[in-house]
Amino acid sequence: MAGSSLACCLLGLLALTSACYIQNCPLGGKRAVLDLDVRTCLPCGPGGKGRCFGPSICCGDELGCFVGTAEALRCREENYLPSPCQSGQKPCGSGGRCAAAGICCSPDGCHADPACDPEAAFSQH
């Protein structure tokens, strides 16, 4: 009797708690992400002129980057969308993409990167 009560309690707790890593898994599991088409991330910032680069990062060529501000609040919605997204065109840094002139962003943060500076590409060394 104690064993079945314990099993019922565990099943009840499991039903009441939902870990985000289970909710965010794509259909077919984690590895199925590789088979999906990558879409452009949500627009954000003033006038929707930026793109989300992480859950609290909004960047645009005309805007620069907003990190952890009200302009980046919309980027939290990406966590609830089932398909992966990608912003920026050129890869940079360690798993990042060029977000604005001279700025490389990944979902974890942003840093200055000369590879993302369009003027540096045309300068002579």
From Swiss-Prot:
GO molecular function, one term: V1A vasopressin receptor binding
Keyword Signal: yes
Disulfide bonds listed in the record: 20-25, 41-85, 44-58, 52-75, 59-65, 92-104, 98-116, 105-110
GO cellular component, one term: secretory granule
Signal peptide: 1-19
Protein family (similarity comment): Belongs to the vasopressin/oxytocin family.
Protein name listed in UniProt: Oxytocin-neurophysin 1
Organism placement in taxonomy: Eukaryota, Metazoa, Chordata, Craniata, Vertebrata
